[in-house]
């Protein structure tokens, strides 16, 4: 592997295993039982009518329809729904009841159990409980049933939980420009360091979700699981993303310094990793001298952020445990919205927010106490 001429940065093997941040490949793989259960449910929900005789053509169409049905929700959503159903069915077995057909009375008791502190079981937040309910409703629909969330046995219990346990939403700490500069400075000058530098800088400048970062391909339609692709221009890079709110374009301009320019970091990573097709961000060999074929998991982004936050002493005034809890993959996205001193319309477009109110939520944190109405009123 050659050496970089720009910035006198040398590519060298660190010998550090990929496990330091991203763990083993098995950690990134979905639980096989949950995956099999999801496939079974989706397969059962798409089938020929009982009165129609099967044929080769129709059977192939059924398989095609099942594939589209599986792709109707994001992979992370599918995993969450499968885990929700697994947890609920285990709870039903423990209580001596059957999850099918849906019983609003039992679902109401389940929701109450989730909100109550019993033994070592942690109390779930209201948002997590609501997400569990969505998962149950989806699973019942796939099995040909309907869960009426407005039934009084569910709705009144949930309303009481909200009234008694609701708390303001906990937002992850935003990573600011000076933070990201300190974080990338902690990375080694080997192939893995080039990759992680590009991940942090591109994620910050693009205001991207961690799943969007790792789903990027070099070109359009390189892989079936692609979430977007990259085009390079003189002025920067254009990312086309299949995001949570639909397709959107993200413009990442070139920075004022190669040390912190996201486009330069991305170009360096692709050049020295010799990646010209398929996933942009992949695993590295243990000696950090070769780029492998397998796409990184979005978990790597969260681990990378936490690791570099600690190494760079970001918010070093706080205990380590609190710093780890404060920062996550979302901190990159929040950082751009909180830092950019531009019209909110441009920030909203970059982040792909469906409403300006979501963008303003970040900017209100940025602008907190900027205008002192107390002093302005003469007090």
Which ranges hold each PLM region?
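Basic, Lys/Arg- and aromatic-enriched nucleic-acid-binding interface segment
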Residues: 180-210, 214, 262
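Basic/aromatic DNA-contact patch characteristic of tyrosine site-specific recombinases
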Residues: 1-100, 109
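C-terminal catalytic core of tyrosine-transesterase DNA break-rejoin enzymes
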Residues: 2, 201, 331-354
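Catalytic-site neighborhood detector that most strongly recognizes the C-terminal catalytic loop/helix
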Residues: 351-378
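C-terminal catalytic core of Y-nucleophile DNA break-rejoin enzymes
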Residues: 244-268, 279-307
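Short, leucine-enriched amphipathic alpha-helices that occur as contiguous helical runs
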Residues: 195-197, 298, 302, 330-334
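N-terminal core-binding DNA-recognition domain of tyrosine recombinases/integrases
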Residues: 63-76, 86-170, 185-189
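Conserved tyrosine-mediated DNA breakage-rejoining catalytic core shared by Y-recombinases
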Residues: 215-271
């Amino acid at each position: 592997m050659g050496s970089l001429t720009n910035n006198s940065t040398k590519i060298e093997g660190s010998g550090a295993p990929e496990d330091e941040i991203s763990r083993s490949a098995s950690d990134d793989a979905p639980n096989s039982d949950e995956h099999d259960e999801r496939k079974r449910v989706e397969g059962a929900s798409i089938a020929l009518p009982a009165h129609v005789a099967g044929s080769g053509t129709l059977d192939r169409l059924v398989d095609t329809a099942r594939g589209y049905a599986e792709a109707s929700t994001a992979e992370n959503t599918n995993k969450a729904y499968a885990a929700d159903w697994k947890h609920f069915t285990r709870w039903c077995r423990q209580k001596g009841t059957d999850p099918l057909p849906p019983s609003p009375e039992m679902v109401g008791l389940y929701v109450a159990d989730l909100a109550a502190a019993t033994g070592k079981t942690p109390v779930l937040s209201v948002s997590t409980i609501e997400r569990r309910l969505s998962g149950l409703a989806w699973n019942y629909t796939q099995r040909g049933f309907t869960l009426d969330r407005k039934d009084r046995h569910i709705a009144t219990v949930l309303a009481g939980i909200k009234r008694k346990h609701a708390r303001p939403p906990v937002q992850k700490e935003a990573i600011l420009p000076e933070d990201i500069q300190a974080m990338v400075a902690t990375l080694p000058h080997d192939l893995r360091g080039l990759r992680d530098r590009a991940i942090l800088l591109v994620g910050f400048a693009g205001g991207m979700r961690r799943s969007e970062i790792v789903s990027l391909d070099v070109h359009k339609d390189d892989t079936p699981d692609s979430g977007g692709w990259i085009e390079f221009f003189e002025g920067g890079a254009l990312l086309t993303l299949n995001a949570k709110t639909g397709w959107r374009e993200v413009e990442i301009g070139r920075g004022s310094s190669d040390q912190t320019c996201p486009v330069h970091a991305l170009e360096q990573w692709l050049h020295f990793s010799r990646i010209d097709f398929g996933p942009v961000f992949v695993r590295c060999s243990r000696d950090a001298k070769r780029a492998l074929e397998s796409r990184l998991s979005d978990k790597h982004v969260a681990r990378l952020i936490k690791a570099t936050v600690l190494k760079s002493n970001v918010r070093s005034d706080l205990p380590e445990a609190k710093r780890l809890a404060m920062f996550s993959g979302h901190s990159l996205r929040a950082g751009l919205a909180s830092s950019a001193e531009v019209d909110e319309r441009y920030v909203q477009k970059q982040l792909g927010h469906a409403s300006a109110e979501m963008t303003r939520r970040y900017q209100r944190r940025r602008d907190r106490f900027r205008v002192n109405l107390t002093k302005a009123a003469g007090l």
